[in-house]
From Swiss-Prot:
Gene3D superfamilies associated with the record: 3.40.50.1100
Protein name (record): Tryptophan synthase beta chain
PROSITE patterns referenced in this protein's UniProt entry, alphabetically: TRP_SYNTHASE_BETA
Family that this chain belongs to: Belongs to the TrpB family.
Keyword set includes Lyase: yes
InterPro entries: Trp_synth_b_CS (IPR006653), Trp_synth_beta (IPR006654), Trp_synth_beta/beta-like (IPR023026), TrpB-like_PALP (IPR001926), TrpB-like_PALP_sf (IPR036052)
Protein's UniProt keywords contain Amino-acid biosynthesis: yes
Pathway info: Amino-acid biosynthesis; L-tryptophan biosynthesis; L-tryptophan from chorismate: step 5/5
Record-listed N6-(pyridoxal phosphate)lysine modification sites: K99
Keyword list, A-Z: Amino-acid biosynthesis, Aromatic amino acid biosynthesis, Lyase, Pyridoxal phosphate, Tryptophan biosynthesis
Protein EC: 4.2.1.20
Length: 406
């Protein structure tokens, strides 16, 4: 097979059909096409409207609390003895993760489109909390679909969503995790097309969602560029972020894709090890297929059926990946690694002890690979890790796993 030709720019996708190379597109029921086309038109109009961007910027500053700091992790850098490690502190955003960046954009778009009812899927609950928060702020009805397994392991976030006025629907079908929550949300959308806006939480789904979510999250990378130039007078040498669907990673990576000298690493969830089959590493252990309206790398069994994903982290427990990541993987622009549950727990503990910051289990996957990458780099190597969420939501789960080991 001929290797794909390197493009002049990695930042021009998707094409007019919503594709990144062979990935992406929109594979949806005919009943959903009017919704999708309406959304595509509305987003194109909003993007071209300076008033929409000005409103979004105002809320990002005064409600979300941006810009988030770029923090030098001095003790962690000394501990590994190689790269100079910086954290992009997305966990300091209102609601505790990067998710709010995208939700704000979509909720402002829903208001612009006159949609009073918002539905969302959630895994770890962070996207659900962000959606419930902004629905409360703007007086919109909010319904969040969440796998029954995730409802159990993310109880603090379930309570938060209910406190914010959202209806949380536990999904009992399939593996009762994120994939199944997304299936139910899509079913709801087909049934309630007239008044409902589907707020997708990651860079997946049918076009225009992967590009739209990426655009709303790209504030992370734009700020990182400005902040690193101000702090160090140059761009970082490398970027590291965890990947489930991959929105926090795409938000950090996208503004740097054409800076060829910047190494970029995405970290998938290897669960109990890719060789065990109990993992969520779609690029490492999957192959191309179609799920939730787009073509991408998926975990599948021999019959082509979607396989169950496993991760200690509810937010990475998804059997696919955003189509732009699949394309960047095939183009070789981004290096995709994976971290096991055990490596992640160790990184979770180490970050807490060295920096006084308890990370979410999701970015702890990225930190697990920093532990391998940083010592191999020279001391003037600038490495940025996207600390995409805080660990409050994970404390009960980690306490149960570690028990008296703390």
């Amino acid at each position: 097979m001929t290797a794909p030709q390197t493009p002049n720019s990695f930042r021009t996708g998707p094409d007019e059909r919503g594709r990144f190379g062979i990935f992406g597109g929109r594979f949806v029921a005919e009943t959903l096409m009017p919704n999708i086309l309406e959304l595509e038109r509305a987003y194109a109009e909003a993007k071209a409207d300076p008033a929409f961007q000005a409103e979004m910027d105002s809320y990002l500053t005064h409600y979300v609390g941006r810009p988030s700091p770029l923090y030098f992790a001095e003790r962690m850098s000394a501990h590994f003895g190689g790269a100079k490690i910086y954290f992009k502190r997305e966990e300091l955003n209102h609601t505790g993760s990067h998710k709010v960046n995208n939700v704000l954009g979509q909720i402002l778009l829903a208001r612009r489109m006159g949609k009073p009812r918002i539905i969302a899927e959630t895994g770890a609950g962070q996207h659900g909390v962000a959606t419930a928060t902004l629905c409360a702020r703007f007086g919109l009805k909010c319904v969040v679909y969440m796998g029954a397994v995730d409802v159990e392991r993310q109880k603090p976030n379930v309570f938060r969503m209910k406190m914010l006025g959202a209806e949380v629907v536990p999904v009992q079908s399939g593996t009762r995790t994120l994939k199944d929550a997304m299936n139910e949300a899509l079913r709801d959308w087909v049934t309630n097309v007239a008044d409902t806006f589907y707020c997708i939480g990651t860079v997946a789904g049918p076009h225009p969602y992967p590009a739209m979510v990426r655009d709303f999250q790209a504030v992370i990378g734009r700020e990182t560029k400005e902040q690193m130039l101000a702090l160090e007078g140059r761009l970082p040498n490398s970027l590291v972020a965890c990947i489930g669907g991959g929105s926090n990673a795409m938000g950090l990576f996208h503004p740097f894709l054409d800076d060829r000298e910047v190494e970029i690493y995405g970290v998938e969830a290897a669960g109990r090890g890719v060789s065990t089959g109990l993992h969520a590493a779609s690029l490492t252990g999957g192959r191309p297929g179609v799920l939730h309206g787009n073509r991408t790398y998926l975990l599948m069994n021999e019959d082509g059926q979607i396989a169950d994903a496993h991760s200690i982290s509810a937010g990475l427990d998804y059997p696919g990946i955003g189509p732009e990541h699949a394309w960047l993987h095939e183009m070789g622009r981004v290096t995709y690694l994976s971290a096991t549950d055990q490596e992640t727990l160790e990184a979770f503990r180490l970050c807490s002890l060295l920096e006084g910051i308890i990370p979410a289990l999701e970015p702890a996957h990225a930190l697990a690979k920093v532990a391998e990458l940083a010592p191999t780099k020279p001391r003037d190597h600038l490495m940025v890790v996207n600390l995409s969420g805080r660990g409050d939501k994970d404390i009960p789960q980690v306490a149960e796993i570690l028990g008296d080991a703390l």
